[in-house]
Amino acid sequence: MSNDTPFNALWQRMLARGWTPVSECRLDDWLTQAPDGVVLLSSDPKRTPEVSDNPVMIGELLREFPDYTWQVAIADLEQSEAIGDRFGVFRFPATLMFTGGNYRGVLNGIHPWAELINLMRGLVEPQQERAS
């Protein structure tokens, strides 16, 4: 990957956060180690500039749900397409959500903060209720 591409700059920022690169063929293995996990799927920031905002938004969003031991995986452009195909995702950026090792759903695109909180709550609250 060339160091001068917008995606490479984004990739380096995500790696600096300690997030784990994952491929489609290694995703299931990663999920056994990270039952409360999110997988960030990207597209070319030149075509979809909001891809660069997604890691910031998701990082903040996860702090709003501290009952989970969140771990974050990131997929490069090629693997984002492969993983997206597996989960029926065709709009990027996308964030796959897993709790207790189970797929809960996907957050597609960028949303206003209050809407994003509500979307996330809809994905994780049923799990919280079962834990009570």
Q: What is each model feature region?
A:
Residues R91-S132:
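Non-catalytic, surface beta->alpha helical segment in thiol-disulfide oxidoreductase systems
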Residues S52-I58:
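Short amphipathic alpha-helical segment that frequently serves as the phosphate-/nucleotide-binding helix
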Residues K46-E50, G105-V106:
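A generic structural signal for short coil/turn motifs at secondary-structure boundaries
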